[in-house]
């Protein structure tokens, strides 16, 4: 903006006042330093600002304060006079980390007001931090280069299309884990969320829907890729972090897939145009350790509205990652079609999209299943899940377990152990059979 414009001058005055404590005399001194001379109107402005904003000084920004300056009668008279205020030097406000919002009362977040503080917290140099966060400098057309911070795996979906798993390389992954465990894990998601939260799982997600007349299941399309960098940045800013720190944290936790990778032979014909556009824009990468927690936080308004919808209908709502579940009595069953329309509309308004082909209305007379858990009378292991896991375990006993790792899990043994433990929890008798097969697997064949 022009340095003689009203906006420039009011912002400079606002920054000067914010560059120190909210004491009227001190603010007058700072305004005098910026404008080169003292003026009578400064005293009234400073007293009014101190009284109005002093109690929440750390949360006031330049934009808010500049509007007050522009509306001050003393300043307006001076601006319209023959010798209007003129900025002779700029006094920037030191970076300030604002207190967390009221809904995070009692949550202690790391104090990272500057990029230097962020770099020190992550134990990297500032220029390294810039490199890991500003990946836009890598040519977007190339499929992959040593400069990329991600490697890519193409996983086939059941419908014949594919999903791209974006796996951060070791150094970036280490930084993301620090952000996850040192910052994001401290911020609670909505209470209806059961995915990627300590002490919660698919069983706690499904259990509230046991014994209901109807269970309605929804699936969100491209859950992680739908969360673009702008939404991540807004969440980080809402936590109180200054502009530059929020931008850098956003850069560390988001990615855009190079165009060359999207048109590679293994992906070109299995990703539609809309999906390709999502991947090209900076988004939460499926495969980064920070993505699940950030996705939950970015979906907070979605959960808030859907939980409110459920309450208004006398129903129950839970979410596990991209799986949404509603359940209730006969009244909900009769209005299921209207609920589908309303849920889809709310999802769109909040930046997500329901996949209508995966929506299921499950009545009491048929099998009601959520995330592999049957909920008709009590949480139970679905027969299809039991058979599929038994087949994988049996094949692992008969041949190299690595050959069964079709989804490329980094620790396939731990993955299978988790699935078996889940089965034991849901159905001890069936789970014991799976555990017996798992114990027969020989893991020294390269897996």
Predicted regions and their residues:
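Non-catalytic, polymerase-adjacent accessory regions of viral genome-replication enzymes
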Residues: 1-139
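Nucleic-acid processing machinery
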Residues: 105-106, 146-156
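N-terminal low-complexity, intrinsically disordered segments
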Residues: 121-132, 136, 182, 187, ...
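Glycine/proline-rich, flexible active-site/cofactor-binding loop segments
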Residues: 153-195, 257-282, 289
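Short acidic (Asp/Glu) and glycine-rich catalytic loops that position anionic groups and cofactors
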Residues: 156-159, 320, 366-373
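Active-site-proximal segment of RNA-dependent polymerases
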Residues: 172-225, 254
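Conserved polymerase palm-domain catalytic core
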Residues: 210-321, 325-353, 359-363, 401-447
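A conserved non-catalytic segment of reverse transcriptases
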Residues: 346-400
């Amino acid at each position: 903006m022009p340095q003689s414009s009203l906006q420039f001058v009011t912002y400079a005055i606002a920054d000067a006042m914010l560059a120190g404590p909210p004491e009227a005399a001190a603010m007058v001194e700072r305004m005098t330093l910026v404008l080169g001379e003292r003026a009578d109107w400064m005293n009234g402005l400073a007293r009014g600002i101190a009284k109005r904003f002093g109690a929440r000084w750390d949360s006031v920004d330049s934009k808010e304060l500049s509007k007050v300056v522009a509306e001050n009668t003393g300043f307006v008279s001076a601006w319209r006079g023959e010798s209007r205020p003129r900025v002779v030097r700029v006094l920037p406000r030191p970076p300030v980390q604002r207190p967390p919002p009221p809904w995070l009362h009692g949550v202690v977040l790391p104090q990272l007001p500057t990029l230097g503080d962020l770099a020190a917290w992550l134990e990297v140099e500032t220029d390294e931090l810039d490199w890991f966060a500003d990946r836009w400098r890598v040519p977007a057309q190339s499929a992959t280069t040593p400069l990329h911070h991600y490697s890519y795996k193409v996983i086939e979906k059941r419908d014949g299309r594919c999903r791209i798993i974006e796996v951060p390389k070791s150094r970036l992954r280490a930084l993301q884990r620090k952000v996850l465990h040192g910052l994001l894990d401290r911020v609670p998601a909505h209470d209806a969320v059961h995915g990627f939260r300590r002490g919660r799982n698919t069983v706690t997600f499904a259990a509230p829907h046991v014994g209901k007349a109807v269970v309605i299941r929804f699936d969100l399309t491209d859950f992680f890729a739908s969360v673009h960098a702008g939404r991540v940045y807004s969440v980080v800013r809402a936590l109180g972090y200054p502009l530059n720190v929020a931008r850098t944290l956003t850069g560390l936790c988001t990615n855009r897939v190079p165009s060359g990778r999207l048109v590679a032979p293994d992906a070109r014909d299995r990703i539609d145009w809309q999906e390709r556009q999502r991947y090209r824009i900076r988004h939460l990468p499926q495969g980064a350790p920070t993505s699940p927690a950030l996705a939950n936080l970015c979906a907070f308004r979605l959960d808030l509205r859907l939980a409110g919808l459920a309450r208004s209908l006398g129903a129950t709502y839970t979410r596990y990652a991209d799986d949404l579940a509603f359940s209730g009595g006969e009244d909900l069953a009769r209005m299921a079609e209207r609920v589908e329309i309303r849920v889809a509309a709310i999802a769109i308004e909040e930046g997500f999209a329901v996949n209508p082909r995966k929506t299921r209305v499950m009545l009491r007379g048929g099998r009601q299943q959520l995330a592999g858990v049957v909920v008709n009378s009590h949480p139970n292991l679905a027969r299809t899940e039991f058979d599929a896991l038994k087949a994988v375990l049996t094949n692992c006993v008969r041949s190299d377990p690595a050959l069964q790792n079709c989804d490329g899990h980094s620790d396939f043994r731990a993955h299978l152990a988790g699935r078996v433990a889940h089965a034991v929890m849901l159905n001890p008798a069936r789970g014991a059979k799976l555990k017996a097969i798992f114990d027969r697997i020989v893991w020294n064949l390269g897996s």
